[in-house]
A protein has these predicted regions:
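Walker A/P-loop
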Residues: 2-22
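Hydrophobic anchor at the beta1->P-loop junction of P-loop NTPases
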Residues: 7, 37, 151
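Conserved Walker A/P-loop ATP-binding site and its immediately adjacent core
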Residues: 16-18, 31-54, 157-162
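Conserved nucleic-acid-binding Ia/Ib motif block in the N-terminal RecA-like helicase ATPase lobe
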Residues: 38, 43-91
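Conserved helix/coil segment N-terminal to the catalytic DExD/H
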Residues: 73-92, 96-115, 129
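Walker B catalytic acidic pair
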Residues: 122-123
Length: 211
């Protein structure tokens, strides 16, 4: 019953199956009754159309709702059914872009607050920017989840700083820093710059990476 895990697994090694197996085990133990799965817009429907149906054991009854900013009647009914009382394992599938919108945040918050849920972010580098609205929203919402998971083959795509927000979503205490800026100051070589009358900090190199 580990509360948080990062599945840093290369493409093709079965991240989706590992997550769904974990969800099934937690559901079987009575630890959760729902899962909120978040993925990039181009692939998030794969979870409802392929991954869950392929890997979730047939003996587990399930309800699946897929988020859409402009839902059809069928989509609306599927999401509403997630809030009905039942013994089914309930999945809400959302694209990460939804968390830049008030409507998307409200839907996810209601789902997490009314279920014992696992929250998973597929391709978690989509939340690597700590200043992005969707990152801030997801980190805040994750506190309402009973369990948290992130999935990606490459957690660092441009800079060691990429890792902070991903791990912060799992547990803000894991890295041992009180804020992104303290993390940045410890691992980055930061200089003050100015442009157009505005000053800002810029990372020009890295240090302490051997830790």
């Amino acid at each position: 019953k580990q509360r948080e895990y990062a599945y840093f697994m290369e493409m093709g090694t079965g991240k989706s199956k590992v997550l769904i197996d974990n969800i099934a085990i937690l559901y079987g133990k009575g630890a959760i009754n729902a899962a909120l799965i978040i993925a990039p817009k181009g692939v998030y429907r794969n979870w409802s159309e392929r991954e869950i149906e392929t890997h979730l054991p047939d003996c587990i009854s399930r309800r699946i709702g897929v988020w859409s900013a402009s839902p059809r009647k069928k989509d609306q009914e599927a999401i509403l059914s997630l809030f009905e009382v039942s013994e089914d394992l309930k999945f809400l599938i959302m694209n990460v872009e939804a968390f830049s919108t008030k409507k998307g945040v409200i839907c996810a918050q209601k789902f997490l607050q009314t279920h014992n849920a696992l929250l998973a972010v597929d391709e978690s580098t989509t939340i690597k920017n700590p200043k992005a609205a969707r990152t801030k929203a997801l980190v805040k919402l994750a506190k309402h989840a009973s369990f948290r998971r992130i999935l990606t083959g490459f957690p660092i795509t441009q800079s060691p700083m990429d890792i902070y927000s991903q791990v912060d979503l799992l547990n803000p205490n894991l890295l041992g820093f009180s804020s992104y800026y303290s993390f940045q100051n410890h691992y980055g070589q930061v200089v003050n710059r100015s442009f157009g009358g505005r000053s800002f900090k810029q990372v020009v190199g890295y240090r302490n990476l051997e830790e």
